[in-house]
Regions:
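Substrate-binding clefts and catalytic carboxylate motifs of secreted carbohydrate-active enzymes
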Residues: 2-216
Length: 216
């Protein structure tokens, strides 16, 4: 278990993170390798949520390319107040701006990116294949994390609708790497927003398969 802050707290080039992780694994080849922290720690390392988003995508891609990396924890969920002296902000109410939510619980753009990267299920295509029906190509994720999907529900909605007002489809159990073709009603002429939720109601992925001629 180790924290990984390449190109921020660790002043090394991003391209060296790959070889650094390999060197640690080589030293302990029989140990499980878990990333206990990674992320962008503002205000010490400035760049805003755009940098946080880019950092998140880059580091997750590295971890998913390493078969020995068992998991990774993003640091952290929300921004917070701190008295920690290492924080560069000098006001009375110093902040650690580390989160994908601000201190008031408002999501940043990086929140959706982390949610999609962390989903145990991927919806890759929505295709019309027979009258009145839409075929969705779905995979069990083999990235981080990966686990069997049980009791999840799927919704297809228009961009202006709340997905909870539409029909709920029960997904079958899906194991990591498994491919399924899932049939739903084609209510929006081959387009729509596909939302998948856990048994507790939390969204794990939400993808927009709608488009307009001007977008092409």
């Amino acid at each position: 278990m180790m924290n990984e802050y390449g190109a921020s707290w660790w002043d090394i080039p991003q391209g060296k993170i790959h070889s650094y992780l390999d060197s640690v694994h080589f030293s302990y080849p029989n140990k499980a390798f878990f990333i206990s922290e990674f992320g962008l720690c503002e205000p010490n390392f400035k760049g805003g949520d755009q940098r946080r988003l880019e950092d998140l995508v880059y580091h997750m891609a590295i971890y998913e390319s390493k078969p020995y990396v068992e998991g990774a924890i993003y640091f952290d969920l929300t921004d917070y107040r701190t008295h920690y002296p290492g924080t560069s902000e000098k006001t009375k109410f110093r902040r650690r701006v580390h989160g994908i939510y601000d201190m008031y619980g408002n999501p940043k753009p990086s929140k959706k990116v982390l949610r999609e990267l962390s989903s145990p299920v991927e919806v890759q295509q929505a295709r019309q294949w027979k009258k009145g029906k839409l075929n969705l190509l779905i995979f069990g994720s083999i990235g981080l994390p990966q686990h069997t999907v049980k009791g999840y529900k799927l919704y297809v909605s228009a961009p202006t609708e709340n997905y909870t007002s539409t029909k709920a489809y029960a997904l079958p159990d899906i194991i990591p790497g498994e491919r399924i073709n899932f049939e739903v009603d084609d209510l929006y002429n081959g387009v729509g927003i596909v939302t998948i939720v856990r048994p507790n109601g939390y969204i794990v992925t939400q993808k927009d398969f709608s488009w307009e001629e001007k977008d092409q």
